[in-house]
């Protein structure tokens, strides 16, 4: 009985720890589990000679654009940074 109780406690702790991880989109529509401490998803967009460029990922703090032509948005829920042409889940 003690073994069963201990097993349930361990499984609960592991599940609670996994549930704390944020999921953000990276390239294309590939979801990625962020590292501990990365509590934001971001989308960075800018234009270059080839058209509109899009970068997405995880961050501990919202990235600050280094140039005025770069636009950054941040959010804090799972899969909240889809490609701009897609709707969030």
UniProtKB/Swiss-Prot annotation:
Binds with high affinity to muscular (alpha-1/CHRNA1) and neuronal (alpha-7/CHRNA7) nicotinic acetylcholine receptor (nAChR) and inhibits acetylcholine from binding to the receptor, thereby impairing neuromuscular and neuronal transmission. This is Long neurotoxin 1. The keyword Cell cycle does not apply. Transmembrane segments: none annotated. The lineage of its organism: Eukaryota, Metazoa, Chordata, Craniata, Vertebrata. Expressed by the venom gland. One of its GO terms (cellular component) is extracellular region. It comes from the Eukaryota. PROSITE patterns: SNAKE_TOXIN. Keywords: Acetylcholine receptor inhibiting toxin, Disulfide bond, Ion channel impairing toxin, Neurotoxin, Postsynaptic neurotoxin, Secreted, Signal, Toxin. Belongs to the three-finger toxin family. Long-chain subfamily. Type II alpha-neurotoxin sub-subfamily. Residues 1-21 form the signal peptide. It is found in: Secreted. Disulfide bonds join 24-41, 34-58, 62-74, 75-80. The keyword Nucleotide-binding does not apply. Has the length of long neurotoxins, but only 4 disulfide bonds, as short neurotoxins. SUPFAM superfamilies: Snake toxin-like. GO terms for molecular function: acetylcholine receptor inhibitor activity; ion channel regulator activity; toxin activity.
